[in-house]
């Protein structure tokens, strides 16, 4: 599948990659890892609670945004982690270079009654998604790949692979942490057609032109997370995420806007 990116977007990616490469090799970040002051803990039990505000596109490809206020909860016990967004994860290998894990998440699907632009389209039911994750870790960055699929075969019925490139570095006397990342998602044609395709029935009921997709890259995204530690217990977290649908996905008649920005702001208390 040929992915077409506009020239401006490519320039932005190159610029961000150059900036992040400078930070990857900074002595400050190296000192952070050496002193183990990154916001992570080796305790057997970690519990974080708080409150978050979220603003995001109504659905992928929507030109409208929705905002929500929701509680924040994150639990880690030994090699097991759980939070409502990422689901349940178990790491069965975690050493200096590699992390391998298995998890169970939830996909909310898509309700055609939630937006007038989806009228006449079939409903994509919510479903559970098993996830197999592999992470390669170095001193300055990590690369993570995670494959997910529809466990119940009652939702999108497909599978997708997300690969992320992450790093992190401190600012302001190691109290503020900057965590940038890049990622792309590759999905099979079953997943893509359920969310972005238009079949014969939908063509008649919705008025959208028939549209069929093959397996390929669904989106490219960049995010920037900032964590500010007020003290040993309380932190303020913010996350800015830019996502762009690409290739045949971006050309789907169901896509009103191919790119979008999501923001998350949280106040977290660490037990």
Residues covered by each model-derived region:
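Extracellular loop and loop/strand-boundary signature of outer-membrane beta-barrel proteins
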Residues: 57-59, 116-120, 148-153, 207-212, ...
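Cleavable N-terminal export/targeting peptides
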Residues: 1-43
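Repeated loop/turn-to-beta-strand initiation elements of outer-membrane beta-barrel proteins
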Residues: 47, 79-82, 98, 140-144, ...
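Outer-membrane beta-barrel "beta-signal"
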Residues: 70-74, 165, 258-271
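Short sequence motifs at beta-strands and strand-loop junctions characteristic
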Residues: 41, 63-65, 82, 122-126, ...
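Outer-membrane beta-barrel transmembrane domain signature
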Residues: 91, 156-237, 243-249, 254, ...
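Transmembrane beta-barrel strands of outer-membrane/channel proteins
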Residues: 49-55, 86, 102-108, 145-149, ...
